[in-house]
Amino acid sequence: MKKILKTLALSLLFIPFIAGCKAPVFYEIMRDVAPEEATVNGVITSITRYKFGTEEKLVTFSSDGLIWKDAAGTAHGQWSCFPNSNQLSGKIIKTAADKSNLYVVTITFHEDVEKGLNLPDAATLWWYDNNNEKWSEVSTPELLPGNFNIFCTNDVDNDNRSAYLRIDDKVYKLNGKDFPTSEKTTGNYNSVVSGDIFFESTASVKNGNYIYWGEGSKLYYSNDTSNPKAEGKKTLALDAGTDISCLAVTSDSILIGRGDFSNSLISKGGIAKTSLKDGIPGNSLESFSTNATSQLASVYQIYTLLVADPNETELNASIYASMGFKGSGSSTSVSYDNIGLWSYYPARGNWNRE
């Protein structure tokens, strides 16, 4: 049985992140470009590959709700509202898909007047019925209070797509509207269970015969897809300087999203990259030939990265990244106008708002 990498996140991604900004380096400022009209705003924690009939789509969410576009789209402004997404109640915090189904998790909140906070009240897993174009709630065990997350392989090959729901140390493989009656128990968050690989890191990606993942600020890789973290199987590639929050690959590069998600109010992260040759990553960070580091700068956090076609080179691929920052932003050169999704398209030749 083909072993497919599954990413296991440790915590619920509904922390109130905020975004923005530009690097204060003269050289980078000179490479800045006029901003496109922002069409996808808000804190975005996932961009999901989804096959709708015969069409390959990308699905994400914004402050306006659930949106999608053709995966082959290579221009600004192509996102549109997902069908009947007004049937969803609550704030969307995550999307996921397997080879046949699309899933969304929403959160409802209540106001704590004494504390002046909006606190999470309940979480709901939704399933989209392709045939009837309607959303239905999936009857799950209670998700809040507790630790849970939805995640998926997000593989380019639709046959390799699987989606999972983790509730504490139980992992359930999703399969449409009916919640599974069996689960996999992970004794720890770096385990192999029934041939499925689960990582504690949200930053992991598989490309060909290699797996790449982040542990803190360090990037590791392995060509042992059955148990890549086993003793003697993993290799340290480099230290990215700041905790690695997400990864994406092209044919010639590994793109590294960074973000400090500790309790510190100092916001730091930004995008970085290293080379990729015959599956082996470089041993140091390398400079971009685009304006990536001036737009996705080190004063904010990168939440997610996606390369539409990993077989393309970095300069010939359509690439998406979402970003944000923590704290008030008053002590750093950030802008609330930059919250949301950013993209690189070959025809445009630079990173800009999506």
Residue ranges and their predicted role:
Residues C21-T45, R49-G53, K57, S63-R161, ...:
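Trp- and S/T/G-rich repeat-edge/linker motifs of beta-rich repeat architectures
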